[in-house]
């Protein structure tokens, strides 16, 4: 049996992820990426110059205050901070001040929007779009990579049926969100989940195909 140390764990995890994405994606990798894996000077040691950067969700780090949480993260060498999206607009200055002078940046924003985009109720869909845009704007101010969204969890009903028409509708909605995000210097991040958590967008390939069609 293979000893499950950190290196082997990462190797097997990344191999599985690569297989999930598919051979087409692997074939599209540029020679530059391959050269980067060998190092800028063409070293034969794979991954020599690669760096694993860790990020914590706000609720993971212990501490009574944001500064205490960030102090804990710094001691561990964590360089990414993932706050929740709920009420983020009112916390922009607080977070900026807390991060000032630290080697920590805002990574992704963990949801926090209201409603859900695949609801059969137009009012609930609008609530989702409006609150997502509010969070996206705040994410842009914080220099965040993007805002995470799941189209609909299993418990969110009634929802639009799993049809091509629904997929087309979803592309339209995400195109609007994505355009808004680009205007604010950030992005919308899809989060595929397993069937026990959501009924739509369960595979990385599904998310990738949406990105392709939205362009």
What is each stretch, according to the model?
Residues 25-63, 71-72:
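C-terminal segment of N-terminal export signals and the immediately downstream linker at the start
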Residues 68-84:
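Catalytic domains of carbohydrate-active enzymes, especially glycoside hydrolases
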Residues 91-106, 186:
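Short acidic, glycine/proline-enriched helix-loop-strand junctions
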Residues 2-17:
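N-terminal secretory signal peptides and thylakoid transit peptides that target proteins
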Residues 60-66, 82-94, 116-119, 157-158, ...:
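Acidic-and-aromatic substrate-binding clefts and catalytic sites of carbohydrate-active enzymes
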Residues 13-25, 40-48, 118, 122-215:
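Active-site acidic/histidine proton-transfer and metal-coordination neighborhood
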Residues 52-58, 81-83, 106-111, 147-149, ...:
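Hydrophobic faces of well-ordered beta-strands that scaffold small-molecule active sites
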Residues 61-73, 127-136:
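Short, acidic/polar
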């Amino acid at each position: 049996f293979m000893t499950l140390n950190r290196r082997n764990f990462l190797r097997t995890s990344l191999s599985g992820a690569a297989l999930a994405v598919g051979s087409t994606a692997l074939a599209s990798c540029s020679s530059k990426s391959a050269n980067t894996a060998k190092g800028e000077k063409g070293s034969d040691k794979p991954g020599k110059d690669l760096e694993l950067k860790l990020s914590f969700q706000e609720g993971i780090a212990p501490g009574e205050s944001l500064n205490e949480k960030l102090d804990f993260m710094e001691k561990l060498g964590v360089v990414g901070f993932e706050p929740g999206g709920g009420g983020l607009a009112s916390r922009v200055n607080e977070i900026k001040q807390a991060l000032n002078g630290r080697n920590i940046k805002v990574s992704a924003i963990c949801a926090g929007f209201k409603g859900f985009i695949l609801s059969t109720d137009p009012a609930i869909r609008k609530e989702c779009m409006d609150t997502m845009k509010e969070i996206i704007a705040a994410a842009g101010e914080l220099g965040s990579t993007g805002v995470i969204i799941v189209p609909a969890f299993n418990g969110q009903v009634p929802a639009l049926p799993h049809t091509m028409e629904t997929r087309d509708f979803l592309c339209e909605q995400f195109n609007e969100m994505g355009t808004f995000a680009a205007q604010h210097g950030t992005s919308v991040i899809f989060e595929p989940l397993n069937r026990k958590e959501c009924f739509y967008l369960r595979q990385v390939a599904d998310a990738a195909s949406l990105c392709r069609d939205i362009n």
